Amino acid sequence: MNREIYDFVAIGIGPFNLSLASLSAPLRGVRTLFLDKKSGFDWHPGMLIETSTLQNPFLADLVSLADPRSEYSYLNYCKLTNRIYSYYMRENHYLSRAEYTRYCQWVAARLPNLRFGCDVQGVLHDPESHSYLVTGQHTMSGQRFMFRCRKLVLGLGSQPYLPACCDRRAAPFIHSADYLRHKYELQGRASITIVGSGQSAAEVFHDLLRESGRHDYSLAWITRSPRFFQMENTKLTLELISPDYTEYFHDLPEARRQEILTQQNSLYKGINASLINQIYDLLDEKVHDGDNRYTLLTNSELRACRYDPLQERFQLDFQHLDCDRPFSHATDGLVLATGYSHEIPACINPIHDRIAWNADGSYRIGRNYAIDHEGSEIFVQNTGLLSHGVTNPDLGFCCYRNSQILRELTGTEHYRIETRTALQEFSPPADGVLKHRPARRAERGPTVAARPLMDIHRATL
């Protein structure tokens, strides 16, 4: 047994906890440990499609929005891997998923506080020492381990969500999370159907559409959504992914928060506008060349899924929501791009009574991301959509959240936590009167001729 007492142990090493590890590693006197069952960092390997990109610019890396000088920044990664000038020449601020994964793996290899291959199987509380015991097994050797810590961070991520009518034990369908692993087999089918309408569905459809010229499959894309809508990324709308809005959202009644989230799907469930346009242009080109084997249909909800093992075909039943009319659809290959859901990890069952729960069995998450009754010992990553809104799954917000969590874990604000970042207001005035802000009196002085605008990026001395 390791006798050292860590200030906190984090379970799970995805991007959010990897960010926390990167921000905590340089802190003197802060003892941390991050555990994960996987053999190394691997983020959505089934969706590392060649053309897929992140929805956030490179500044939304693991550390820059908290500490731009960090050695674990994406720009430092580019510098140390001799890629910074080529990245500058590309003039593209959006990373591919594969590039982001390589960057995260580069960071993970340099952090001293990560332990992969550690399957956490239980968390116990020791009331005498006011500490937690994290127990489990090394996946390679089978040897047991036990670590003692004062506080916990849970960052176990999400699991592929399947519609209620789909039973993986009865049918060999594929969730988009496993797409690349089954892609070759899938392309040998006579017909392929994708169900879903978000970014993952669009990336899978686009990938199969691009390569359809080398194969004979027909391709269908069916979604319950009323349209293939793009992700909103205008600047004032993006301020809904800000500390200011998170504070406002968290203070609203729960019923109102639920209503708002249904209105904000396009903020985190939409498709990149560039990808939508690429799909349209490619479809248009193929159709005009006489290739008509593609079907796109909206407003259609999957109600039943049956698989015939003899014919190796799926029989799908849909309900068209606008027309209120059922229809059936047969396909040889099925990809469910139906998103992800969060599950309560079994390892925390022994400390169930120390955690605050909602009536529906979900965590009751405090404003500081704590879920224990004291609000100071157990923290969570990426499970607070209803409590904290659309900032919850956003990569660009993880540095701000982790700066807050680190402050709660250590009692010190190691990284500056901005109190206001938005240019707009979200709450009405406390006194019930909205007043104009006073104008700043213009200073009198000589008139200066306007200077011509320059392309700063290409400016030379």
From Swiss-Prot:
Transcription found in the keyword field: no
Pathway recorded for this protein: Siderophore biosynthesis; alcaligin biosynthesis
Keywords from the UniProt entry: FAD, Flavoprotein, NADP, Oxidoreductase
GO terms classed as biological process: biosynthetic process
Top-rank taxon: Bacteria
Family the UniProt entry places it in: Belongs to the lysine N(6)-hydroxylase/L-ornithine N(5)-oxygenase family.
Descriptive protein name: Alcaligin biosynthesis enzyme
Phylogenetic placement of the source organism: Bacteria, Pseudomonadati, Pseudomonadota, Betaproteobacteria, Burkholderiales
